Regions:
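Sec-dependent signal peptide recognition
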Residues: 2-11
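Beta-propeller blade termini and top-face loops
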Residues: 20-157
Length: 157
């Protein structure tokens, strides 16, 4: 009798578990989708909230875009090209007035000096790791630590 009751309880539990929907990402995090304008191929590889409320997004293809009012109506978000021609940027972070971008071969400091919304000053902050050109080599950056330092994680083959 006890074995039958145990089996019945186990079967009922398994049936309930099967009936429950598999969890999805939105069960844990709020997901906001931003419509990407025609002509932009977005392979998002880094995001950073800027002090002025814009959202900086970099693409693995080498562009950085600024999105205005990212918390507003998604259909009214304006995209503007901030920088282009970067080498597989995989991180963005803002620190001390500079937008830092970790590219395949360097950590770059980027700034819009003349205030026109486009980056016009690019400075190498660090490039001490070197690359061979192998397609599996990537550099991933972190947010600045307590000392303001960025740590670079390398995938070298």
């Amino acid at each position: 009798m006890i074995k039958q009751l145990t089996r019945l309880t186990l079967l009922a539990g398994l049936a309930l578990a099967q009936a429950a929907a598999d969890p999805v990402e939105s069960d844990y995090y709020k997901i906001d989708a931003f419509p990407v304008p025609d002509g932009i191929v977005m392979e998002t590889s880094g995001i950073e909230m800027m002090p002025d409320g814009k959202l900086a997004i970099c693409s693995r293809r080498g562009d950085i875009y600024m999105l205005s009012n990212p918390y507003g109506d998604p259909s009214k978000i304006e995209w503007s090209l901030y920088a282009e021609g970067l080498h597989e940027p995989l991180n963005l972070s803002f620190n001390d007035g500079w937008l830092y971008c970790t590219q395949r071969g360097e950590l770059t400091q980027i700034k819009d000096v003349d205030g026109d919304g486009r980056a016009d000053l690019f400075q190498t902050a660090n490039d001490g790791w070197g690359i061979t050109g192998d397609y599996h080599e990537y550099a991933f950056g972190t947010r600045p630590d307590a000392n303001g330092d960025t740590w670079i994680v390398l995938c070298l083959t």
